[in-house]
Amino acid sequence: MKIYLVGGAVRDALLGLSVKDRDWVVVGSTPQEMLDAGYQQVGRDFPVFLHPQTHEEYALARTERKSGSGYTGFTCYAAPDVTLEDDLKRRDLTINALAQDDNGEIIDPYNGLGDLQNRLLRHVSPAFGEDPLRVLRVARFAARYAHLGFRIADETLTLMREMTHAGELEHLTPERVWKETESALTTRNPQVFFQVLRDCGALRVLFPEIDALFGVPAPARWHPEIDTGIHTLMTLSMAAMLSPQVDVRFATLCHDLGKGLTPPELWPRHHGHGPAGVKLVEQLCQRLRVPNEIRDLARLVAEFHDLIHTFPMLNPKTIVKLFDSIDAWRKPQRVEQLALTSEADVRGRTGFESADYPQGRWLREGWEVAQSVPTKAVVEAGFKGVEIREELTRRRIAAVASWKEQRCPKPD
C-alpha cells in the first residue's frame, strides 16, 4: 500500500497559496484492508474512506469508463492493480493531475508542473470531453487563477467548444450549474467565468439571458464601452472589488437583463429596462433553482438600480416608498446591498472605474434618517391600528425631507 497527496492541495502549495482541503490516493489496497486499518467508508459509487484521526478523504486508486450520458454516466474500477498514473489520468486538468509522496517528491506524469509554470489550464486526456461538468470547472478555475495570469490552452478551449456544440451541457442538472456558478462568484475575478463560457459557446446554452446582452448597444455618452454584455462583465468585476457577498455579485450580474428585450429599432435607448428585467431574473433563477434570498435581491436591483442613480431628484415620499418596496424595515442589509450594486453599475464603465458615487452615500444617510424615527412615539401619541403605519410614514417622510434639504439638495 502506498499513499499519495493529490490534486488541489499539491497544486496550491506549488503556487504558494494556502491549502484548505487535502485529498489522498491509496495505491495497492482493497476496501477491506482500509476498513481493517480503521478507515470509515463513505463513498457509495466508488471506495472513498475517512481517516480515523484527521477525517481527511482517502480514495482507492481508480479508473473511470464512460457508460452513459452526462457527468454521472461513468463506471468506476478500483483495484490494487490500478496505478497512480492510471488514477491521475482520469483527472480534468494537468495541474490537478499532480501527486506528492511521503518524501515530498512530486509525481508528474502529464506535465502539470510545466503547465503550472506556464500558467496554462490544459486537459489531461481526450476523456475530458466525456464529462460536461468540466466545461464549468475549467471556467471556474480560469476565474480563480486569473490574478496569477492563467489562461486556457487553445486545444482545451477547442474541446470545450466541441462539447458545447455536441449538446453535452444539456445533461447538466440545474443544481450542478448553480453550484459551479456560485463557487465562481466567490472568486477574485468572477467575470472571467462568464467570459470563458461565452468563448466556448456555453453562455448561450446555460445563461441565454446574459448572452443576449452582447451586441446590444447603449448610449455612448453614458456607456463608452457601448456593448451591454461588456458592461455587465465590467460591473461584475467592480462588484467583486466592492463586496465578497455572492448575492451582491449575482444581483449586479443580472441588473441589466431587461436591455436584452429592447427592440433593435429603439436602440441604443432602453427605457423601462429595469422593471422589464425582473421577469428575466425570475426566469433565470427558477431555471437554475437559485436560492430565494439571492433571487429576491437580484429582482430588486434590476427594478430599482436606475432609480437610485437619480437619488438627488427623488422627493422624500418616493425615498420612503423605496425603503418600503425593498422591505428595508425588516431587511435593513438590503440598503447597503443596493448601494453597492448601484455603485458597481456606475463604476463598471470604461473610464469611470474610479468615479465617486455620492448617491450611495445619500441612500445610506437617508435610510439612517428614516429608520431613526421612533415607532414608540407614534403609539404613545395615541395612534391606533392602520393609523400607526400612516403616521409613521408621514413622520419618516418629514424627517427625510428635512435631511434632504440640508444634505442632498435637488440639483438645479
From Swiss-Prot:
GO MF term list: ATP binding; CCA tRNA nucleotidyltransferase activity; cyclic-nucleotide phosphodiesterase activity; magnesium ion binding; phosphatase activity; tRNA binding
Needed cofactors: Mg(2+); Ni(2+)
UniProt-listed InterPro entries: CCA_bact, HD/PDEase_dom, HD_domain, NT_sf, PolA_pol_head_dom, PolyA_RNA-bd, tRNA_CCA-adding_enzyme
Keyword Nucleotide-binding: yes
Residue stretches in coiled coil: none
UniProt remark on cofactor binding: Magnesium is required for nucleotidyltransferase activity.
Domain of life: Bacteria
Residues at which CTP binds: G8, R11, R91, R137, R140
Reactions catalysed, as given in the entry: a tRNA precursor + 2 CTP + ATP = a tRNA with a 3' CCA end + 3 diphosphate; a tRNA with a 3' CCA end + 2 CTP + ATP = a tRNA with a 3' CCACCA end + 3 diphosphate
Binding site for ATP: G8, R11, R91, R137, R140
Cited PROSITE patterns: HD (PS51831)
Domain notes: Comprises two domains: an N-terminal domain containing the nucleotidyltransferase activity and a C-terminal HD domain associated with both phosphodiesterase and phosphatase activities.
PANTHER family assigned to the protein according to its UniProt record, in alphabetical order: MULTIFUNCTIONAL CCA PROTEIN
Family, similarity comment: Belongs to the tRNA nucleotidyltransferase/poly(A) polymerase family. Bacterial CCA-adding enzyme type 1 subfamily.
Miscellaneous comment in the UniProt entry for this protein: A single active site specifically recognizes both ATP and CTP and is responsible for their addition.
Record's function text: Catalyzes the addition and repair of the essential 3'-terminal CCA sequence in tRNAs without using a nucleic acid template. Adds these three nucleotides in the order of C, C, and A to the tRNA nucleotide-73, using CTP and ATP as substrates and producing inorganic pyrophosphate. tRNA 3'-terminal CCA addition is required both for tRNA processing and repair. Also involved in tRNA surveillance by mediating tandem CCA addition to generate a CCACCA at the 3' terminus of unstable tRNAs. While stable tRNAs receive only 3'-terminal CCA, unstable tRNAs are marked with CCACCA and rapidly degraded.
HAMAP family (UniProt xref): CCA_bact_type1, CCA_bact_type2
Assembly: Monomer. Can also form homodimers and oligomers.
The name this protein goes by in its record: Multifunctional CCA protein
Organism: Shigella flexneri serotype 5b (strain 8401)
